Swiss-Prot record:
Domain of life of the organism encoding this protein: Eukaryota
Keywords: Cell adhesion, Metal-binding, Nucleus, Repeat, Transcription, Transcription regulation, Zinc, Zinc-finger
Gene: TRY4
Transmembrane segments: none
Region (Disordered), start-end ranges: 1-71, 146-260
SMART domains: ZnF_C2H2
Bias (Low complexity) ranges: 1-29, 37-65, 156-165, 228-244
Induction pattern: Expression is induced in biofilm and repressed by fluconazole. Expression is also regulated by SS1.
Name of protein: Transcriptional regulator of yeast form adherence 4
PROSITE patterns in the cross-refs: ZINC_FINGER_C2H2_1, ZINC_FINGER_C2H2_2
Role summary: Transcription factor required for yeast cell adherence to silicone substrate.
Length: 286
């Protein structure tokens, strides 16, 4: 016995495809909530940046205004008219105006020729990139000091040499004068000895300072040999070079000796003491 077969109804494909192909749309609440989040984040970032800028500007203006003090206690007296910044020293203000407002860069690196507005920036550049090379930084002031020191040392050495030369010349002059006085004294002693040995009165001395000059005139010798001494006047002029500051001056000494006419006696010249007395008298008279 067979069971009755019911007819199979065909499957509606259109409905299934339609259900599967329809996209799922997100709820309207989610769409509406996504936009305010992004806008709020961007607004927060903008406000934070603006607040930071305002804080830094206010802090810089408050810390560098006219009349404020540094941490060390120095007052900022010099005020910039362009940006209202104040400085403790005038050179700091001029450096600020030249580098910041005038855009001047007078300091250049000696190796890479990069210009800088301040010397400390050039020093930092040379230290970081060129291992602190002296070629990168100009040393004009230091070399000028060294040149000044060298010139001072040269001038000092020259003055010392001049002083030593002057002292040496003075010592030489003194030595020459001492030698001259010694030679004069020795020659005077020799003349006295010769006169005492000869037994004549042909010795005529002229005193000029510390030196003595002997005048042995032939007329006196002739008169003494004849036996009578007439009254005569003899004048002798001698020039003595005296060195005073390397200048020579001729000194003329005139001496007159009056010899009275008397008979020549041998008894008057026996003792050397009488001769010395007569010599001293003649020197005093002259």
């Amino acid at each position: 016995m067979s069971l009755p077969m019911s007819p199979v109804s065909p499957i509606n494909t259109t409905t299934s495809t339609s259900t599967t192909t329809t996209p799922l749309s997100p709820p309207s609440s989610i769409e509406n909530s996504s936009h305010p989040l992004s806008t709020s984040i961007s607004n927060n970032s903008i406000t934070s940046d603006s607040s930071l800028d305002s804080n830094t500007s206010t802090s810089s203006t408050t810390t560098t205004n006219y009349g404020t003090k540094t941490p060390s206690g120095n007052a900022r007296i010099f005020n910039c008219t362009l940006c209202q910044r104040a400085f403790t020293r005038e050179e700091h203000l001029t450096r600020h105006t030249l580098s910041t407002h005038n855009k001047l860069k007078p300091f250049t690196c000696g190796i890479c020729s990069r210009p800088f507005s301040r010397r400390d920036l050039l020093l930092r550049h040379a230290k970081n990139l060129h291992q602190g090379s002296e070629v990168a930084v100009s040393r004009i002031r230091k070399s000028y000091k060294h040149c000044n020191k060298d010139n001072d040392s040269k001038s000092g050495s020259d003055s010392n040499t001049n002083k030593t030369n002057k002292n040496g010349k003075k010592q030489e002059q003194e030595d020459d004068e001492e030698e001259g006085s010694r030679s004069d004294s020795s020659s005077g002693a020799d003349d006295e000895d010769s006169n005492t040995s000869s037994g004549g009165s042909n010795y005529h001395a002229i005193g000029s300072g510390n030196k003595r000059f002997v005048n042995n005139s032939p007329q006196l010798k002739k008169i003494l040999t004849n036996g009578s001494v007439p009254s005569t006047t003899t004048t002798s002029t001698t020039t003595v070079p005296t060195s005073t500051n390397n200048d020579t001056a001729s000194i003329t000494n005139s001496s007159t000796s009056h010899i009275h006419q008397r008979s020549l006696n041998v008894e008057d010249y026996d003792t050397p003491e009488k001769k010395r007395l007569k010599m001293s008298v003649n020197m005093l008279v002259s």
